[in-house]
Amino acid sequence: TDKLLWRVMSDSGQVIREHYDMAIAYLEGGATYYVHDHVNADRKFTFLHVDYGFAGYTRELDKNCYPDFERIFTVSDEVKKSFVKAYPECSKDTYVFHNLIDQKEIRRKAELPGGFEDSYDGKRILTVGRLTAQKAYEISIDAMKILKDHGIKARWYVLGEGELRGKLQSQIDRLGLQKDFLLLGAKSNPYPYYKQCDLYVHATRFEGKSIAIQEA
């Protein structure tokens, strides 16, 4: 699996010989393994952004890693619950640290030029995220087909890129949704789209705590 690959890649990584007061792994997986195995620091913290079990991680893979961290931060109560279930011995060292967003800056950027360039006058549905299996876009495409078949006047827009673009576009073409479900690619400023849409949808198979939902 990709989780095992990250483990193997970290095992072969270069050791950082400098000594640090503190080292922080910003993400589960490779970053956490690397900080644990190859960084020399007095204190080590790590962050967990996904449901530990649903994301495919296992105690068998990580049992010699997480218990060695002084602090483990999760982005939500549910992520903490899932992690502590796998590592009850880490419960006292695990804390919830919610994602931080700059609301003032988001509102400022939402007022900048940009956003939808068509003249569509129906309901606009928006999703923002990478085009990966985790985000379950194929289900969203099927949902758009149902809306269209029921005569609902709506158009679904997706901001983001990823390895599934070709596969998703093929599904869109097969269902005749070329004008109804649009893959717009990644945008440097997505916030005008948030402001202009009628409904934001975040369909995903698993999630820690979605920053996109917080931003919306």
Segments the model singles out, each with a brief description of its role:
Residues 3-10, 49-68:
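Nucleotide-sugar donor phosphate/pyrophosphate-binding loop at the beta->alpha transition
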Residues 7-12, 106-124:
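A short helix/loop element that forms part of the nucleotide-sugar donor recognition site in Leloir-type
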Residues 31-33, 41-58, 71:
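A short, histidine- and acid-enriched strand-loop-helix "catalytic/donor-clamping" loop
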Residues 78, 100:
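Carbohydrate-associated surface elements
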Residues 123-146, 152, 163-169, 211:
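A conserved mid-protein helix/loop that constitutes part of the nucleotide-sugar donor-binding site
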Residues 186, 205:
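Aromatic "clamp/platform" in nucleotide-sugar-dependent glycosyltransferases that forms part
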Residues 191, 210-215:
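Short alpha-helical segment that forms part of, or immediately flanks, the ligand-binding pocket
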